[in-house]
């Protein structure tokens, strides 16, 4: 647990002396988040510093590879810059991490359910791992699609259509055989939607089946942990102790 590892706060403080305000202002992810949260007029220092805090999270435990989405690439580059600057002053102490992007390009930057921005808790456009089956279905059935696709007979657009973006990310050949056997693959589904004659409700129901299958085992495991909260705290305690030791090395 981050709050139980004081070394992370210490590293953040040390690193803050290696990064300029102007460099943080140029970080594309920071700029986007400032705009998203309407912080232009008054930026909290803690928020502005979070790329440095993230660098501490990564380097304290000598991470060599960091799995990220496309929008986090500037953050990792910021970390790499801090590592290079630190090592140039204090010898080769820190590990410069590489990034690991999803092989499926559609997974690199999933939009929120509203289709306008990335998933954000503050915007309420997220599907959470903790969501119930009903919550997930409600969010999927209200997903942004194609505003010009008013009638089922109307030709539709798959580009910029949030449902198809999620299908690109999560659908597999077996899903069609199980849930939508009249189509051999996703391309056939896209072609039909583009021609017209395929309604949004049908593709949303298909996506819901896929997402429920994906989230069901996660939901079940979470339910098991919820039955023994003291055990969860013990896992967090032991994990924090282990990482404190690793951060000291």
Stretches found by the model and what they are:
Residues 1-115:
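Divalent-metal (Mg2+/Mn2+/Ca2+)-assisted nucleotide/phosphate chemistry catalytic cores
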């Amino acid at each position: 647990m981050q709050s139980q590892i004081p070394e992370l706060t210490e590293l953040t403080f040390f690193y803050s002396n290696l990064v300029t305000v102007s460099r943080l202002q140029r970080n594309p992810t920071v700029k986007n988040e400032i705009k998203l949260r309407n912080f232009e007029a008054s930026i909290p220092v803690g928020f502005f510093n979070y790329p440095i805090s993230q660098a501490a999270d990564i380097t304290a435990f000598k991470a060599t590879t960091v799995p990220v989405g496309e929008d986090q690439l500037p953050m990792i580059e910021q970390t790499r810059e801090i590592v290079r600057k630190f090592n140039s002053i204090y010898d080769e102490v820190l590990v410069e991490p590489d990034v690991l992007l999803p092989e499926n390009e559609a997974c690199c930057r999933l939009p929120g359910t509203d289709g306008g921005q990335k998933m954000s808790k503050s915007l309420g456009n997220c599907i959470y791992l903790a969501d119930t089956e009903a919550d997930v279905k409600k969010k999927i059935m209200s997903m942004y699609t194609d505003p010009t696709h008013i009638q089922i007979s109307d030709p539709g657009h798959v580009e910029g259509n949030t449902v198809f973006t999620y299908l690109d990310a999560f659908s597999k050949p077996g899903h069609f055989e199980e849930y939508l056997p009249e189509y051999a693959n996703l391309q056939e589904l896209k072609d039909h939607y583009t021609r017209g004659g395929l309604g949004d409700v049908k593709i949303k129901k298909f996506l819901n089946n896929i997402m429920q299958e994906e989230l069901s085992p996660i939901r079940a495991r979470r339910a098991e942990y919820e039955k023994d909260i003291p055990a969860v705290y013990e896992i967090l305690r032991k994990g924090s102790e282990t990482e404190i030791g690793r951060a000291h090395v």
